[in-house]
Amino acid sequence: MGSCASCANKDKCSSASKDGGCSSSVPAKLGTNYGNIKNVIGVISGKGGVGKSTVTGILATQLAKKGYKVGVLDADITGPSMPRFFGINEKRADIVAMDSEGKQVKFVPVKTELGIKVISMNLLMEVEDDPVIWRGPMVTGVLNQMFKDTDWEELDYLLIDMPPGTSDITLTVMQTFPIKELVIVSTPQDMVSMIVKKLVTMAHKMNVCVRGVVENMAYIECECGKKMRVFSKKSSEEHAEYLGLPLIGELPINLDLTEALENGKAEEYVAENPLYSLIFEGLY
């Protein structure tokens, strides 16, 4: 169950249930044409470069390990990175015409080693590093189509890797997607926390429940086992308290994970590392 009990805005948020958790009821919004999705979870950050996509990949991997049917929608249209995390960046999603004129299409997502279904702009383009040079309405229109027209089949969880900040995409997802709750990713700096707080305030104004915050790059672990906080003397709990959110967990700076990401082996590394199971244990 989600926990909004520590949120300063819980009395104003229609997503907060009487017992202090996020309401399980989700208002009818944008639907899917192919498949059924039980839970839609948004993963978001206030700024780029804090490891939001990495956290999305870690959470998706942990859910798949538990036996859940999981999908990932890479909503960062102009800066997609989920295919790289899962090592599927050389593959492409199939686009199937559903009528004779080709006006209605179906996207067939790419599956990872654990069976996670992924759709991303980079899986729909011929060349991975070609830029997407579109204005807001075009970007949001394509994102809506990726959500509606992907063949998700049956999913227990769809994780949406959202772009950072409070842009058009964020507004579109919060307004029109059937988001159950958000997981916010931050790093231990006051400047980052200040910007994240804007995002938290936006979520409350949009009546979107925030499950809590994951603090990434919280520390480096010495070979002796001591945790060294290199970016802030404040604890993760203090940063979470400033945001008015429960602390889901803290992730270290991990060079082995970085190397696995570079080699397209992050999913395998995360699945085998007990640290990530412990951090997200009990979240879903």
Swiss-Prot record:
GO MF, any single term: ATP binding
CDD domains: Mrp_NBP35
Keywords: ATP-binding, Hydrolase, Iron, Iron-sulfur, Metal-binding, Nucleotide-binding
Gene Ontology terms: biological process: iron-sulfur cluster assembly
InterPro entries for this protein: Mrp-like_CS, Mrp/NBP35_ATP-bd, NUBPL-like, P-loop_NTPase, YlxH/NBP35
Organism: Clostridium perfringens (strain 13 / Type A)
Family, as annotated: Belongs to the Mrp/NBP35 ATP-binding proteins family.
Binding residues for ATP: 46-53
Oligomeric and partner information: Homodimer.
Protein's name according to its UniProt entry: Iron-sulfur cluster carrier protein
PANTHER family for the chain: IRON-SULFUR PROTEIN NUBPL
Gene3D superfamilies the record matches: P-loop containing nucleotide triphosphate hydrolases
Any Pfam family hit: ParA
